[in-house]
Regions:
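Alpha-helix boundary/capping residues
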Residues: 23, 35-38, 95, 102
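A short, surface-exposed loop/turn module that caps and links secondary-structure elements
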Residues: 33-59, 109-111
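Enriched for short, Lys/Arg-rich terminal
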Residues: 1-9, 28, 43, 62-66, ...
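Beta-strand-connecting loop/turn residues
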Residues: 12, 52-53, 74-75
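Short, electropositive, low-hydrophobicity segments enriched in small/polar residues
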Residues: 16, 45-48, 86
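Solvent-exposed, charged helical/coil patches
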Residues: 1-36
């Protein structure tokens, strides 16, 4: 079983959870079920993004919801952002920044 880690900014904000919590109860439950399947190694509909270190988990409900993540060491899945098809480019750009921040802070903590 894989561990899921959710990105948190330096000031303690969690963009993914803020996005997920903005969804209806039905969609929150469906997102949580999908994340549970990811923990079990069952990713479903996903792809690596071009020109990015991120991958995109495509959800077949709502407004074309997407979850952006990075698998690290084949164990930890870092969930960095969520959004829908209408704001996809902006969300990916921001998720790339979040991933860079996460990796930089992780490197700093290793020293």
């Amino acid at each position: 079983m894989k561990e899921i880690e959710v990105y948190t900014t330096q000031d303690g904000k969690c963009p993914f959870l803020e996005w997920r919590n903005s969804l209806s109860t039905e969609y929150k439950v469906r997102v949580n079920k999908r994340l549970q399947r990811m923990r079990e190694g069952l990713y479903g509909d996903w792809k690596h993004l071009q020109n990015s270190k991120l991958s995109e988990l495509r959800l077949d409900f709502g407004k074309g919801y997407r979850i952006y993540f990075k698998e690290l060491d084949n164990v930890i899945i870092l969930i960095v952002a969520g959004g829908d098809k209408s704001d996809q480019k902006r969300t990916i750009k921001q998720a790339d920044k979040y991933l860079t921040d996460y990796l930089n802070r992780s490197k700093d903590n290793d020293n």
